[in-house]
Amino acid sequence: RGGKLIWMINGVAMNKDSLFNESGKSYALPQELNLDDYFFHKGVRIEKTLIQDLYCAPIVLASGYENNTQYVPYPWVYYPIIKPKDSIIGKDTGPILCRYASPIKTIDNKLSKFLLLKSSDFIKTSSFPAVINLKKATSKIEPSTFLQKSKAISYLVEGQDYSLFKNRIKPFKFNGNMEKGKFEMVIISDGNIAENQIDKGIPLSLGYDKWTNNFYSNRAWIVNVIHFLAGNKNYLSTKGKKWNFAFFDISKINKFGSFWKWSLILLPFIIGIFSLFISSRIRNKQLKL
């Protein structure tokens, strides 16, 4: 019958809590929701793979024992940070955090499709079944293996189409049935994009990461999607905050990261020793006078 829909679909079925048990492993399998035919009818397909992106958010792991425990952030390629497309929905919206997202492919048909979210140009994909191991977080990232170009994570699909259930036998008589209608839907291949983190049983603001104290624009983007589908274009046109994205060059970070890390550690120490030496020399000269 048409209408407005938001789909937030996990292409992967995985127990995330298993990552933090003794083995530090979890198994990713295809998520079977019996929606493949429906999405194919609308001209999109959620692939049975998992995106790994060089431009990613960290995962925070505990290091040490008892009172000496420290929480250390490590880049986690399964947490892509997405820059929204410059559309009426994504305009003036900051970076969005995705978790365990799958690529979306489009299929040619008469419906209109507009790209809303996509990964960076430095990715690779994992086929299912896949083993997700936390040891990967502490291993050195090899940028040379991230050779695939960007993959779509969200599309707006709109148009007028026949129902997937056309010509099927109805379980009961329904006089108001319409087999063709106008519709708009947003499909997102990440069911975690609208998931709040929980702290002491209380849900935190959507987009806030309690482990890194970072704020992402998940909430603002989802609100924009809802306003767009509800026809509230005035709300979207009056937004005026500008975001300037400055992504790091991952290849340079991996090449020179160790040098700058040790420089930042040792340089203050060397400056401190030099300052003590100079002040000691000045003090000795003053005592001799």
Regions found by a protein language model. Give the residues of each.
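Selective detector of the "anchor" transmembrane alpha-helix that sits immediately C-terminal
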Residues: 257-281
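Acidic, S/T/G-rich, low-cysteine, solvent-exposed domains in lumenal/extracellular/periplasmic regions
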Residues: 1-234
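Short, aromatic-rich amphipathic segments at membrane interfaces
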Residues: 235-264
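Cytoplasmic C-terminal tails of single-pass
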Residues: 286-289
